[in-house]
Amino acid sequence: MKKNELKKIIFKIFKKHKLVHKHSNICADAIINAEIVGAHSHGLSRLKMYCDRIKKNLINPKPKFKIKKYSNSILHLDANDSIGFVAADFAIKQAIKLAKKTGIGIVGVKNSGHYGLSGYYIEQAVKKNLLALCFTNAPPAIAPYGAKKSLFGTNPISFGTPSGSCLLYTSDAADDRYR
């Protein structure tokens, strides 16, 4: 299937679940990116999960963001239980604006959900010639050594930096081993 055809299908699914046009596009782009880079665990395989969370009112399909400005370089976003793609997209765009204006841009986000590959957002900043860091917490998924019960989240972290010899360098990792 061609990328454009797949995007239309994903877009329609999110629209059916009451996301606005712009947010449906943001989600579709992020999911397709995960598939293109081979991170299928963060692509189409998660689509049903997002839809189920919307149906269960765990994701607000029409969030109203609240922004608190701490300084010319630091913002805090209450994403109003937004789907993570939309909150992360907004946050990285704001961080880029702040960094271009003041030299550093920090945006904290609360009340959002799973946002897919953090490297996807890092890449946006690196393409603007900025060094970028992105990290989040996650629910318990890892058991301590010798234990049976999960206590630690995977807590993804990614970073990226412009590189003179290639377009960009990014790393996207988590605290867990690949299974």
Task: Go through the PLM ranges and name each one.
Residues 15-18, 37-40:
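N-terminal and secondary-structure boundary signal
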Residues 21-32:
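Short, well-structured alpha-helical segments
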Residues 46-91:
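Active-site cofactor/substrate anionic-group-binding motifs, chiefly glycine-
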Residues 77-148, 155-162:
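A generic, well-ordered mixed alpha/beta core segment in the N-terminal half of proteins
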Residues 165:
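Expand to "…catalyze enediolate/carbanion chemistry for C-C bond making/breaking, isomerization
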Residues 169-179:
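Single conserved hydrophobic/aromatic residue that forms the stacking wall/gate
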